[in-house]
């Protein structure tokens, strides 16, 4: 059979499902992250980071299943980003499921407000931005962060750069 065409954004493969009103989950497997969880498609379970845009069930309905399935597969607890106003409600959702099936549902919940940033890795950050929907919602932009050697230190031998760095000199600028 023919290979499925691959969708890429800025060189990152994108997978997922989006059926309006039924299910939305967009996955960036090489970054190990998903935007919204829909009904928890199997492919989403392997992603370490999850970003929830709003509380409609077609975007958040699979959340307990996502965390439970990761636990079943002995994957590390996921980091889940939610709009700040949803934090308490999402924790209550997990508490209800814990009470029903005595599972741990281990995860890290990160409430992000519009404009707030979070460091995913040394070279990757996320920032929440406002979106417009029938209920409060937000989107997330993921961007790379690099440390670039300051102009003054270009051309110096590596040993000298190392010495400066160890002595506490700021030798780099942050580039996004």
Curated annotation (Swiss-Prot):
Q: What class of enzyme is it?
A: hydrolase
In alphabetical order, the GO MF annotations are: 3'-tRNA processing endoribonuclease activity; metal ion binding
A Pfam family matched in the record: Lactamase_B_2
Q: Where in the cell is it found?
A: Nucleus
**Which Gene3D superfamilies does this entry report, sorted A to Z?**
Ribonuclease Z/Hydroxyacylglutathione hydrolase-like
Query: What is the annotated role of this protein in its UniProt record?
Result: Zinc phosphodiesterase, which displays some tRNA 3'-processing endonuclease activity. Probably involved in tRNA maturation, by removing a 3'-trailer from precursor tRNA.
Quaternary assembly? Homodimer.
What is the official name of this protein in its record? Nuclear ribonuclease Z
